[in-house]
Swiss-Prot record:
Belongs to the phosphohexose mutase family. Its EC number is 5.4.2.10. Its cofactor is Mg(2+). One of its GO terms (molecular function) is phosphomannomutase activity. Pfam families: PGM_PMM_I (PF02878), PGM_PMM_II (PF02879), PGM_PMM_III (PF02880), PGM_PMM_IV (PF00408). The active site is at S93 (phosphoserine intermediate). This is Phosphoglucosamine mutase. Mg(2+) binds at S93, D230, D232, D234. The keyword Kinase does not apply. GO terms for cellular component: cytosol.
Length: 437
């Protein structure tokens, strides 16, 4: 039977096979047993799932403080600030509105270790002894949750954002009520799009996975910069004043150099995943900064940061963790820190991001193959070695097995698009030929 927990909690189609009211209630009861706050994004299904989670927790003797619609990183922050035992976020992040998910945070606002998730999952199949009468938990509204989080974010800024015109794309998500307030209070001139959540339009052609609208708005309004969040606001991607997309790797490069300059980049090390662009490693090496690479997934970035005591890490997708101020990826925090660097240096985002050259990257998903044999086929390994020799220091190849389906991802970076495409297509064809099921 496949593991219930994925890389970011339990996720699936709301009221489908996985994310049901019954599962939410039982999962909450199991979590109460193992771990012993409740928040969500604006998806319409979040209402019944949050109610079921709250009921499951309270019926297990846990006092629940319902923070309502807030970003995932706000939940993590409030767990620590409120000294809660644990917390729950109802969200499917950047997924479309029909999906939803349940993710748990431990005390201090940190993501659960695999071992704790496994214990919760195992508890689902065991009988649960529930309290009765006066021993059940209470469900209360966390009235000042949003205000606490806003004050925390504003307190992280070293420079006000006066004079910077920013377009915010809130993805019709959890950032809608908070991000514009934070940027405005910090002094920026704010234009907002994707800020009318109705429960069904979250991430719908807006947000960090659909940047065309943001780029158009930045150009139309003559803004200095655009910032895009995803549905639960744990991501941040940007657009410069020319309409060019600035991805998570480029944002990490800007913030790493800023933190290194101020003596805040622990061990002069940045934590990134194997999917981060070769240009990031080259730019950091030129500035005497080490890039530590992890598996894909912000949880693995967090684990490496916690183990090594590092202060900055993230993913190309826009999950960035700034350890001084957050225990998880925080899109609003990342955005204001990025604009803070613009304010501190007087440089445009275009200038700041130019520290890194983005190498063309081509990804091909090869389906219907034996993912367990990646790396074991001699002919395929020889082809990869030949391609790597041709690319030299100006490219790289990564083959990655999917964790959920019979698929292998072939990724090639090169100095030019045509070379990257040629090698990716040749290797993908060979993967199909050699590893077909």
């Amino acid at each position: 039977m496949p593991r219930l927990f994925g890389t970011d909690g339990v996720r699936g189609l709301a009221n489908g096979e996985t994310i049901t009211a019954d599962l939410a209630l039982r999962l909450a009861q199991a979590a109460a047993h193992v771990l012993g706050q409740d928040a969500r994004d604006p998806r319409v299904s979040g209402e019944f799932i949050a109610a079921a989670v709250a009921a499951g927790l309270a019926s297990s003797g846990v006092d629940v403080f319902d923070a309502g619609v807030i970003p995932t990183p706000a939940t993590a922050y409030l767990i620590a600030d409120f000294d809660a035992d644990f917390g729950v976020m109802i969200s499917a992040s950047h997924n479309p509105a029909p999906d939803n998910g349940i993710k748990f945070f431990a005390a201090g606002g940190r993501k659960l270790a695999d071992e704790l998730e496994d214990r919760i999952e195992a508890q689902l199949s065991r009988p649960v002894l529930l309290p009765t009468g006066a021993d059940v938990g209470r469900i209360r509204r966390f009235a000042d949750a949003e205000d606490r989080y806003v004050l925390h974010l504003l307190g992280t800024l070293q420079h006000r954002l006066d004079g910077i015109h920013v377009v915010l794309d809130c993805a019709h998500g959890a950032a809608a009520g908070i991000s514009p307030e934070v940027f405005t209070d910090a002094g920026a001139r704010v234009t907002v799009i994707g800020n009318d959540p109705d429960g069904m339009n979250i991430n719908d052609r807006v947000g960090s996975t659909h940047l065309d609208l943001l780029a158009e708005a930045v150009l139309a309004h003559g803004a200095d910069v655009g910032i895009a969040h995803d549905g639960d606001a744990d991501r941040c991607l940007a657009v410069d004043h020319t309409g060019a997309i600035i991805d998570g790797d480029q944002i990490m490069a800007v913030l790493a150099l800023s933190m290194a300059r101020r003596g805040l980049l622990a061990e002069r090390t940045l934590v990134a995943t194997v999917m981060s662009n070769l240009g990031l490693r080259i730019a950091m090496a030129e500035n005497d900064i080490t890039v530590m690479q992890t598996r894909v997934g912000d949880r693995y970035v967090l684990e490496a940061m916690n183990e090594g005591g590092y202060s900055l890490g993230g993913e190309q997708s826009g999950h960035l963790v700034i350890a001084e101020h957050a225990t998880t990826g925080d899109g609003i925090l990342t955005g204001i820190q990025l604009l803070g660097e613009m304010a501190a240096t007087g440089k445009s985002l275009h200038e700041l991001a130019s520290v890194m050259t983005v190498y063309p990257q081509v990804m091909i998903n090869v389906r219907g193959v034996d993912r367990d044999r990646v790396g074991d086929d001699a002919e395929l390994n020889a082809a990869v070695a030949r391609a790597e020799a041709e690319l030299g220091d100006t490219g790289r190849i990564l083959m990655r097995a999917s964790g959920t389906e019979p698929m292998i991802r072939v990724m090639v970076e090169a100095a030019d698009q045509a070379t990257a495409e040629r090698h990716a297509e040749e290797l993908a064809a060979l993967v199909t030929e050699r590893l077909a099921i």
